[in-house]
């Protein structure tokens, strides 16, 4: 099954991303949430990452393709249990944790274009506070517009 490209608009930045087939239940759930609008805030325990806290939300997801040390551009969903449910958006070095200790979360989405702006987004949220974020399925026009805007910046 081919998954759609996801456009992420976060603050003034845009990214194209690819869903990870090795987390099929997480991907399926995420697609039902789109378009998903929320606020990104800076993590408290994990390092260079942003998160969307979801409190006691229970998606009834298993751990799949989970990691505690995601790479920049990887987006994870922690399904809850030990700590609160959350999305984690990594822009640099991350060791995923909470006040309860180390955690692992489902890696289901990866930024594939625009990654050079990840650090700028992270630092913007760190110094200025919460920013709007929108995850949506990108149609061909949105992808073309994204790429033309990137090319114009060069």
Where are these regions (language model features)?
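N-terminal intrinsically disordered, low-complexity, charge/repeat-rich segments that act as generic
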Residues: 1-22
């Amino acid at each position: 099954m081919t998954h759609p490209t996801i456009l992420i608009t976060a603050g003034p930045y845009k990214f194209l991303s690819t869903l990870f087939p090795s987390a099929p239940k997480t991907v399926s759930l995420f697609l039902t949430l789109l378009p998903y609008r929320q606020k990104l805030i800076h993590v408290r325990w994990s390092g260079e990452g942003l998160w969307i806290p979801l409190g006691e939300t229970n998606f009834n997801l298993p751990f799949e393709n989970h990691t505690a040390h995601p790479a920049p551009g990887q987006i994870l969903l922690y399904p809850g249990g030990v700590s609160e449910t959350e999305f984690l958006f990594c822009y640099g070095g991350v060791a995923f944790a909470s006040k309860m200790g180390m955690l692992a979360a489902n890696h289901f989405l990866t930024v594939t274009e625009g990654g050079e702006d990840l650090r700028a987004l992270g630092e913007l949220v760190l110094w200025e506070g919460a920013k709007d974020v929108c995850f949506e399925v990108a149609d061909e026009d949105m992808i073309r517009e994204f790429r033309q805007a990137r090319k114009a910046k060069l």
